[in-house]
């Protein structure tokens, strides 16, 4: 009967919708391990970063006698090339007087070969998922300043110069021209090796900004309003060629000039307070480009079977991008891999006193989980021997308070962490 057909159709639609809304079943039992590749293990010294590979990264220059830092170097001991840095200024015009400025020039040469060689060790720990900090090609140690999103970093693979040549032959806007670099292929091998041990792979991306060495940003700098990517970024004022000085101004993430922000349909100021907001990415081409990159790593060989790809994404500064974009992003990801996992970096509402309520991001249409910094904060205060240690009662109250308003499935899918690349380690 028509009623029966209608009922079956409704049930099918409901099941599909539920599959999109719910976290994947595997996310409830994850034991996480985070890998910051540049600092993990140097398995191939032949691909170590060179001075030219740092172009575009903070502080905006490379000392003449710069070299890779030995793996066992005392962290607080100056490198030989520290000498004279006080006479230089960083991208913001600040003198290079402090250790924390100088140390950002350090590179240790960690790479994907190093990860591959340590997979048996990782498996022996009992982990079930690896969260990789960004692997995209970028000049910094952290890779949140992408030169491009589509390829793995040149210094993480076996042939940096060959990979640079491949990238140069491609049209960044046309996925049909994209090839697999040696670093890309090695990452696919790392995924395969981890999957063989039943270890899931989550890849970190920041769609909120690029680096200043990004191909699209470089075109904007060169061609200004005439650039086909002029609407990709938050440009506040264009340069007037009739004057001797540059009037060009733009928004960088958190005011950092080396991280130009992708433009959204709504501007929200996040310096004083972060809160959820509606909207989308302004340029349809920029959004489509992000979707192409996402598909590339969910299904690297493009055969429709996502088994060879990553199992999801960790999304950087996720609260600083609009909810409308994230809803579309979730649908795109789940259409490629129905079991993919999306985790947002939802952290401060007002630093350093108030953490952001993640509920608006955990209602089935955005993320499966967030990096659980509320759990982190309570756990650190309880387990650390610090002046602000809390009691068992306070710990339990804190945990119950912030889990009580969240869906059960999302609570189980959370990434409960005791440290990350953004906070001190527990020791």
What annotation goes with each model-predicted range?
Residues 409-427:
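Active-site clefts of carbohydrate-active enzymes
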Residues 24, 28, 44-68, 138-158, ...:
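Aromatic- and acidic-residue-enriched segments that line the glycan-binding/catalytic groove
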Residues 78, 135, 220-336, 343, ...:
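Polysaccharide-binding and catalytic clefts of secreted carbohydrate-active enzymes
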Residues 37-39, 130-142, 204-214, 316-321, ...:
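Short, solvent-exposed turn/loop segments enriched in Gly/Ser/Thr/Pro and often Arg
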Residues 190-199, 208-209, 217-225, 292-295, ...:
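Active-site-proximal helices and loops of the catalytic beta/alpha 8
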Residues 16-200:
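N-terminal structural segment of carbohydrate-active enzymes
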Residues 1-10:
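Bacterial N-terminal signal peptides
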């Amino acid at each position: 009967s028509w009623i029966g057909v209608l009922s079956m159709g409704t049930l099918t639609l409901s099941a599909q919708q539920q599959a999109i809304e719910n976290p994947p079943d595997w996310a409830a039992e994850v034991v996480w391990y985070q890998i910051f590749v540049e600092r993990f293990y140097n398995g191939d010294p032949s691909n170590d970063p060179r001075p030219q590979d740092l172009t575009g990264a903070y502080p905006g220059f490379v000392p003449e006698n710069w070299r890779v830092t030995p793996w066992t170097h005392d962290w607080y001991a100056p490198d030989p090339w520290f000498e004279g840095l006080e006479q230089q200024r960083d991208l913001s015009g600040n003198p290079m007087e402090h250790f924390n400025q100088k140390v950002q020039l350090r590179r240790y040469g960690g790479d994907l070969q190093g990860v591959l060689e340590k997979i048996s060790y990782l498996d022996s720990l009992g982990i079930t998922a690896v969260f990789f900090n960004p692997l995209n090609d970028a000049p910094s140690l952290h890779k949140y300043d992408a030169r491009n999103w589509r390829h793995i970093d040149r210094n993480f693979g076996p042939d940096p110069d060959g990979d640079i040549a491949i990238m140069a032959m491609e049209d960044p806007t046309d996925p049909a021209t994209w090839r697999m670099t040696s670093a890309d292929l090695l990452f696919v091998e790392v995924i395969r090796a981890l999957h063989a041990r039943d270890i899931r792979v989550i890849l970190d991306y920041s769609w909120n900004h690029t680096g200043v060495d990004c191909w699209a940003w470089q075109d904007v700098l060169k061609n200004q309003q005439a650039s086909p990517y002029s609407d990709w970024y938050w440009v506040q004022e264009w340069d007037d060629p009739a004057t001797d000085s540059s009037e060009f101004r733009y928004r960088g993430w958190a005011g950092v000039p080396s991280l130009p922000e992708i433009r959204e349909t709504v501007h929200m100021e996040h310096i004083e307070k972060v809160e959820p907001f509606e909207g989308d990415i302004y340029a349809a081409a920029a959004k489509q480009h992000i979707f192409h990159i996402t598909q590339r790593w969910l299904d690297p060989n493009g055969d429709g079977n996502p088994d060879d790809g990553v199992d999801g994404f960790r999304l950087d500064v996720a609260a600083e991008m609009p909810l409308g974009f994230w809803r579309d992003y979730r649908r795109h990801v789940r259409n490629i891999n129905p079991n993919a996992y999306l985790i947002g970096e939802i952290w401060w509402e007002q630093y350093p006193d108030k953490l952001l309520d993640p509920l608006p991001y955990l209602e089935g249409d955005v993320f499966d989980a967030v990096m659980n910094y509320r759990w982190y904060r309570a756990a650190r205060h309880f387990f650390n021997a610090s002046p602000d240690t809390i009691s068992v009662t306070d710990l339990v109250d804190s945990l119950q308070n912030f889990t009580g308003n969240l869906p059960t499935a999302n609570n189980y899918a959370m990434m409960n962490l005791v440290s990350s690349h953004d906070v001190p380690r527990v020791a």
